[in-house]
């Protein structure tokens, strides 16, 4: 049977109390050192790296990438997932190329694959991602880079 819980005003945090706690730096955060970018691929925007150690002891990174011609907002219309590998998390990484791209047609992920997350499940790997489908739009995917930002906005909104 569910337990009923009641809270009094004294049990709740005030917004001032929450804000002051949020301003404090945690011990974990104090130990972080920025390294800069660890993965750059010429001609592409790179986003959302999902690293995992493989059975070979190397770091495998699955990441989103899309051509610079699609501008930064092109993630929703022309993104693919690629794979890179390194001996340590800090790199350097060797790009192994695309592992998954939009399937075309009217599939839910016909145009773009984005935000990969790789997980080890027993002796297999599962790659989770989001996708976008532009098959019902009144434009070809290859025509998007030539649009002005203002003209592109309506397609971006439809895909998001």
Residues covered by each model-derived region:
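Beta-rich carbohydrate-recognition and catalytic domains
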Residues: 1-48, 52-111, 119-160
């Amino acid at each position: 049977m569910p337990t009923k819980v009641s809270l009094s005003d004294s049990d709740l945090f005030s917004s001032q109390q929450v804000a002051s706690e949020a301003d404090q730096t945690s011990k974990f955060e104090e130990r972080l050192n920025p390294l800069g970018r660890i993965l750059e691929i010429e001609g592409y925007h790179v986003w959302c790296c999902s690293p995992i150690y493989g059975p070979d002891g190397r770091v495998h990174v699955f990441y989103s990438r899309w051509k610079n011609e699609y501008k930064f907002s092109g993630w929703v219309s022309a993104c693919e997932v690629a794979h890179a590998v390194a001996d340590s998390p800090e790199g350097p990484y060797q790009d192994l190329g695309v592992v998954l791209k939009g399937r075309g047609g009217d599939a839910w992920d016909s145009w773009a694959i984005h935000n990969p997350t790789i997980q080890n499940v027993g002796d297999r790997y599962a790659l989770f991602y989001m996708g976008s489908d532009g098959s019902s739009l009144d434009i070809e995917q290859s025509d998007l880079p030539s649009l002005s930002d203002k003209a592109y906005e309506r397609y971006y909104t439809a895909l998001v």
